[in-house]
Every structure is written in C-alpha cells, then in structure tokens.
Amino acid sequence: MKNKLIIALTLITLIISSCSKEECEGCRASITGKVHAKNYNASFTQLLSEYYAPDEDVYIIYGDNNFYDDKITTDPNGVFEFKHLRKGNYTIFVYSKDTTFTIASCVEAKYLDAEIKDKEEVVELPDFEIIK
C-alpha cells in the first residue's frame, strides 16, 4: 500500500511539472510595451482623442500554442510587462475595434511577435495602436 502511494504521488508530481507554462520564477527576462488608443466617432472619420490606454487587457501566447497563456492589464500609463519568461518565441496581442465593418464581432486582434534570447533580456515592443 505504501509503495502504491509513493508511486501515485511521484506520477502526479511528474504530470504537474510537465504541464507548467513557460513562466519561470528564476528567470528575469520580460516583454514590455504600451497600448496607445485612438477614440473616433462612430463612422471613424473624426479623431476625438488619443491617449495611452489604462486597464487594457494584453495577452501572451507561449511558443506555438493556439490559445493565450496569460493575460495582464495595462497600468494607468498604458504600460504592460510580462515577467519571468524563459528563452523562446512569444506572441503578444490586444483587441481593437474593427474600422472596416467586416468583422462580425466588431473587434480585431493586433499581434506583435517577440523573441527572448537571454534569461535576463528585456524586450521592448513598439506601441500597440488600438481603436476605442
């Protein structure tokens, strides 16, 4: 009975550790950037305001995954930072209003790719431009 319990606990530990995301507590690499928003009228013909967007959701995809792995929110200055990342490729995205009126959901994803080559690297992305 004792051996079965030890084997079961070992298997559970192996399964849990093999399913871990690419976030790494010992790593200091990060991806940072800003989200810049433009607010237009309903027909998108007149720019009403623009600003760095606070409280905007920003998503990250680790490697070749098909769904986002983590989500954070921009700070009051529109800044975001994904921390504790391993070496590898990442896709960062945000959502913006569709200005072409061709997407049923009325929103489109804006993507930027990033590569971390060193465990202490800080990758600074260009600003995301979104329509509010």
Segments and roles (model prediction):
Residues K2-L9:
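Sec-dependent signal peptide recognition
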Residues I15-S18:
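C-terminal motif of bacterial Sec signal peptides marking the signal peptidase cleavage site
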Residues A29-K38:
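A short, amphipathic beta-strand motif
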Residues S49-K71:
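Short amphipathic beta-strand segments in non-cytosolic proteins
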Residues D75-H84:
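Short, surface-exposed beta-strand/beta-hairpin micro-motifs centered on an aromatic residue
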Residues G88-V94:
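A short tyrosine-centered beta-strand micro-motif
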Residues K97-L125:
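Structured interaction patches on ligand/partner-binding surfaces of diverse proteins
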